[in-house]
Amino acid sequence: MDKRMVDQEFHNEDTDLELSLRPTQLKQYIGQSSIKSNLEVFIKAAKLRQEPLDHVLLFGPPGLGKTTLSNIIANEMEVNIRTISGPSLERPGDLAAILSGLQPGDVLFIDEIHRLSSVVEEVLYPAMEDFFLDIIIGKGDEARSIRIDLPPFTLVGATTRAGSLTGPLRDRFGVHLRLEYYNENDLKEIITRTAEVLGTDIDKESALELARRSRGTPRIANRLLKRVRDFQQVNEDDQIYIETTKRALQLLQVDQHGLDYIDHKMMNCIINQYNGGPVGLDTIAVSIGEERVTIEDVYEPFLIQRGFLERTPRGRKATALAYEHFNTTNEKRE
């Protein structure tokens, strides 16, 4: 699968920009107002009790700020943070080494926590509940269990697939926070702030236009802004103007709904080749040269969310809105 401008997943080239833009306090964090309000209360209460914050589960689509929030939690609690990914914890000993190195109150952030192996997950249960580890040393008749006491800590788990977590793991989190897609006003504010960090000016129309095409995702908004800035600098403009923005987005093949060439390819396939459906996912995959799982997990969720595609027992079907949008877009291209 090729990288897309509107891909919500992390790209390597996003690293420097995301790090430079990452807020360190809740008051600097744009959007997710309900989550911020709740965290302010939970953090203040924990500090008043001089206790670690309850374990926190952050879930929602990629690119919405779960990693950023985990760092903010550590900063607000005035403790250190250790960051790891679920797949990197292959053995119970890997987890034990990390947990035993934490200081009282520290935050352990596990990204992609739904990908923890079952053996590691079972070791994590008593660590989360009672702050101890039971480790088996040796094999066979010589095997024995060693209990390791741990300092109280806060586990922050992040996942894009909360439904994939086992019940016992999910229930051990005291705080569950779902990150929602951002509205246009919040994205516009994020884009304006990013432009300042990048050292460029952007007019209000351009910031709003980018916000509209960013799929409610700050990561995509910042990525699009960087590319539009390229056009501005080559044109030697003193700021990013709306004309340059629209021209750049047209060349990048990102339309007014944030749909790109792959979205158009898939929807045109359903509408033109299969009369709007219903058509099976395997048939679509063969027709557009993509894997079934990629279509199901990456491409179609946004199309369904925006009302262009629906799932039926007989397959995928284009909606009336899809006919209106894609036929109009195709006519403009012709």
UniProtKB/Swiss-Prot annotation:
Q: Name one GO molecular function term.
A: four-way junction helicase activity
Q: Which InterPro entries match?
A: AAA+_ATPase, AAA_lid_4, DNA_helicase_Holl-junc_RuvB, P-loop_NTPase, RuvB-like_N, RuvB_C, WH-like_DNA-bd_sf, WH_DNA-bd_sf
An example GO biological process term is:
DNA recombination
Q: Where in or outside the cell is it found?
A: Cytoplasm
User: In which residues is ATP bound?
Assistant: L21, R22, G63, K66, T67, T68, E129, D130, F131, R172, Y182, R219
- Annotated region Small ATPAse domain (RuvB-S): where? 183-253
Described function: The RuvA-RuvB-RuvC complex processes Holliday junction (HJ) DNA during genetic recombination and DNA repair, while the RuvA-RuvB complex plays an important role in the rescue of blocked DNA replication forks via replication fork reversal (RFR). RuvA specifically binds to HJ cruciform DNA, conferring on it an open structure. The RuvB hexamer acts as an ATP-dependent pump, pulling dsDNA into and through the RuvAB complex. RuvB forms 2 homohexamers on either side of HJ DNA bound by 1 or 2 RuvA tetramers; 4 subunits per hexamer contact DNA at a time.
Q: Which residues lie within the region annotated Head domain (RuvB-H)?
A: 256-334
| Identification of the protein by name | Holliday junction branch migration complex subunit RuvB
Annotated Mg(2+) binding sites: T67
Keyword check for Cell wall biogenesis/degradation: no
The EC code for this enzyme is 3.6.4.-
Q: Which UniProt keywords apply?
A: ATP-binding, Cytoplasm, DNA damage, DNA recombination, DNA repair, DNA-binding, Hydrolase, Nucleotide-binding
Family assignment from sequence similarity: Belongs to the RuvB family.
Domain comment from the record reads as follows: Has 3 domains, the large (RuvB-L) and small ATPase (RuvB-S) domains and the C-terminal head (RuvB-H) domain. The head domain binds DNA, while the ATPase domains jointly bind ATP, ADP or are empty depending on the state of the subunit in the translocation cycle. During a single DNA translocation step the structure of each domain remains the same, but their relative positions change.
